[in-house]
């Protein structure tokens, strides 16, 4: 499984659409096996989506994301976990323990999880 997290100054980037760096983590048996970082220099959302899809990302954990970009990513088969904020390593550790939605990492004002297949 491959997850990705947009990062900024050691934290989850506040807005996926404008993020310039993406941390990509490979998981085997719910444990990290490798990681690498890429720069997202594509400004066009469809190109940005194509780039993320080309990385083989299964799940993307992010802060805010526009509805059009979320729909593009969902249509590409990528599960989106939006509305998350906090230090990157803490968020990843909590995700790997399966308790991300029950943690204190939800962005202020976020109305609830909108995951793959969501229409909101």
Residue ranges and their predicted role:
Residues 58:
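Short acidic/polar active-site loop segments enriched in Thr and Asp
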Residues 61-62, 80:
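Conserved SAM-binding loop
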